[in-house]
Regions:
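Bacterial N-terminal signal peptides that target proteins for export
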Residues: 3-14
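Amphipathic alpha-helical protein-interaction segments enriched in hydrophobic
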Residues: 8, 330-331
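C-terminal motif of bacterial Sec signal peptides marking the signal peptidase cleavage site
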Residues: 23-24
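Active-site mouth of glycoside hydrolases
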Residues: 30-296, 304-329, 335-428
Length: 429
């Protein structure tokens, strides 16, 4: 045997040995990453799921809770094959703030609504019963759950701006301060430790040992909001520290950033690569919003959906290339498209959306290893176009027109989703 053949044989042997070691270490039901691929129970794993930000609120016994509805929604989702749910751990700050979801979980730094914490516990229990999993995000760069702005307000006393009132440019200028505010970040780190290190009050099981959690996520669309190198360094620094804290507490679960891709990285490939090269980050995420990004015309959604699909294809392929280079699976964990006529009405048709969804789902098992549409409205019956306290929760959070992007059980989109799940490559049932 030649020296080159011997070296190659040894390389294959050790690669196989490494895979066996990884498989032996992985706990049943937990998802790992091997050679850029999700693996669950020794098998390649891809999925189609949804965003269900309000799940833990429904699971609570307090204000906003509706356990009967939660059971109905989860049973429907499970039957449809939608077993990966991207979920908000909880909102921050006071109730009664315009465009913020409520009730809030963290009412003051380190002070929690215990009823909602038990709701989060129960939500995970209900997922586990159905062999479903959650991606749990801990922060938010946007106002609708408190996030950056609330931590800044707590640390500095500066009132957090609301973009629908102050405008998005002033809001983003304020939010960039979070990246260099050590006091704000420390408050967030304490929150991370409290949640990731939690033990479920119902089962007595540590969150770190619960296969109902697919992954922890640093935040919803964490953005730098700045071209300033010092601010960018601060941004990377706090995410790196957050990743370190999470992995020190929990080495069983995957970790992702919640980043949107280039559109959430100041359109800078170098910043995007830095974000996804943070130690401990296991897979790459992207979000795609054709209307928000002017890829689709709200006055002619059906006439411009093909343009949106073309732009989406380019976005996915470009990010898939970087993900492969980094050895990460790629998940489009948030994408949405308005109802026909740009109408929020529950009865509005979804022809353009269905065409758009069909394309994104076709990429699962090709350039994507997961896709979560935004968002699940299910059996909700919105009472107002702008969410008001006491209204049913739907896929669109409080700052958005209720029904515009949400998927109801009555939508034709559901048939398309079920067909996509049944036909997707390597889908692990």
């Amino acid at each position: 045997m030649s020296a080159n053949i011997m070296k190659y044989s040894l390389k294959l042997f050790f690669a196989g040995l490494s895979s066996l070691i990884l498989l032996s270490c992985a706990k049943p039901g937990f998802v790992t990453v091997e050679n850029g691929q999700f693996v669950r129970d020794g098998k390649p794993f891809t999925y189609i799921g949804t965003n269900f930000w309000y799940g833990p609120i429904l699971a609570s016994e307090g204000r906003g809770g509706d356990i009967d509805r939660l059971t109905r929604e989860l049973d429907y989702l499970q039957a449809a094959g939608l077993r990966n749910l991207r979920v908000l751990v909880g909102a921050d700050g006071a109730d009664g703030v315009f465009s913020r979801v409520e009730p809030t979980l963290q009412t003051a730094p380190g002070v929690y609504n215990d009823t909602l914490l038990v709701g989060l516990d129960r939500f995970l229990v209900e997922l586990g019963k159905r062999d479903m999993q959650a991606v749990l995000y801990l922060n938010n760069s946007w106002e609708w759950s408190g996030g950056y702005g609330q931590y800044l307000e707590w640390a500095t006393g500066e009132k957090a701006l609301i973009p629908l009132e102050a405008g998005y440019w002033p809001f983003m200028q304020q939010m960039r301060k979070f990246q260099t505010s050590a006091e704000s970040q420390e408050l967030f780190y304490n929150h991370v430790k409290a949640i990731v290190g939690r033990t479920n009050s119902i089962t007595g099981k540590a969150y770190a040992d619960d296969p109902a959690i697919f992954a922890w996520q640093i935040g919803n669309e964490p953005r730098c909001f700045s071209d300033d190198p010092a601010v960018r360094d601060g941004f990377i620094g706090w995410m790196t520290q957050t990743a370190r804290i999470i992995k020190e507490i929990d080495r069983n679960h995957l970790l992702s950033t919640g980043n949107e891709g280039l559109m959430g990285s100041e359109n800078d490939p170098d910043l995007l690569r830095r974000i996804n090269s943070i130690p401990g980050v296991d897979y790459m995420t992207i979000h795609i919003w054709p209307y928000n990004w002017t890829w689709a015309d709200p006055a002619d959604l059906e006439g411009t959906v093909n343009d949106a699909i073309d732009r989406t294809e380019e976005y996915i392929i470009g990010h898939a290339k970087m993900a492969r280079e980094l050895g990460h699976p790629l998940v489009c964990e948030e994408f949405g498209f308005p109802r026909d006529g740009f109408s929020p009405q529950r009865t509005a048709t979804t022809r353009a959306r269905d065409r758009y969804y069909k394309y994104v789902f076709s990429q699962v098992g090709v350039n994507l290893q997961g896709a979560n549409f935004w968002g699940w409205s299910g059996f909700a019956q919105p009472l107002h176009e702008q969410w008001q306290s006491g209204d049913p929760y739907a896929g669109d959070p409080a700052q958005e027109a209720q029904g515009l992007n949400g998927v109801y059980v009555t939508d034709t989109t559901l048939d398309l989703i079920v067909n996509a799940i049944n036909n997707s490559h390597n889908y692990n049932n």
